Amino acid sequence: MLGKARELANYQDEPEQLPTGSFGKNAFLRLGFERRPERTVLATLHRRAPLIVQQALYWDEGMPTLPCVSIISNAGGILQGDRYAIEIDLEPDTQAHVTTQSATRIQEMDANFATQTQTITLGANSYLEYIPHPIIPHKHSRFVQQTEVTIHPTATLIYSEVLMAGRKYYGTGELFHYDLFSSKFHAAHTDGTSLFTEKFIVEPARGNVSRLGAMGSFHVFCNLILLTPKTHADRLFETIDPVFDMDEGIAWGASRLPNDAGLLFKVMGMESAPVRAAIRKIWEAARQEVTGASLPENFLWA
């Protein structure tokens, strides 16, 4: 059970406000994509506030048959005692793009913690771009996320997770003032074969996050996971060069995942804009390699 993770042992007290996981604090979202003759459609949609999805839109000029789904929250952020769950299921030969409306803010906490579980299933020859906006942990927030992926060997997942250092420009600045951020990602093939598990825990009060070998002078961290067949991964690994540019405030590189699962990219930046640009470059290269399609022009407000 996610709430019993060892790193949460010191945060088991109940909030004085609404009880943990009560109505309005137990968000749920299920998205199911199916293939129709002309395009992929969002065939299944179950939602429980604060998580909301209205409908799929087809605004991607590079892939006009790609359903694009934006996850909305009407809560103004994730609060102490919140328990969120997201399920995304792609049937064989489907394609989808899922993102969030804006950054996810983990609000300041004085009791308990917040969790989010993500369960993603990809059928044969399916393709999913899951690229949410950044996570911004506020002062004394505690957040644990667990992502479970079941993927067919012929499918592709582009998964991005961006963690900000906090509210950098709030007051005198909140850099690494949160209590806990924990994220676990596990992937397995549809036959049950485990591919890899990655987990990172950040507890700024227990160690200097800005030390050399951790964040250093950077304030934005992105974990971008590309699960794709080996032929795609091999070509991308040879064509995407690492970058270290302190003048632009950006550094990133790639490594191979175990069991020929794909590639793992780590991106670090001083601000979110160069990190977003790096994500877009990797995303565009992966899409071109796997689907043959290009990305549309970036939105002016992106």
Swiss-Prot record:
Keywords: Chaperone, Cytoplasm, Nickel insertion. GO terms for molecular function: nickel cation binding. InterPro entries: UreD. The keyword Chaperone applies. One of its GO terms (cellular component) is cytoplasm. The keyword Cytoplasm applies. Pfam families: UreD. It is found in: Cytoplasm. PANTHER family: UREASE ACCESSORY PROTEIN D. Belongs to the UreD family. Required for maturation of urease via the functional incorporation of the urease nickel metallocenter. UreD, UreF and UreG form a complex that acts as a GTP-hydrolysis-dependent molecular chaperone, activating the urease apoprotein by helping to assemble the nickel containing metallocenter of UreC. The UreE protein probably delivers the nickel. This is Urease accessory protein UreD 2. It comes from Brucella ovis (strain ATCC 25840 / 63/290 / NCTC 10512). The gene is ureD2.
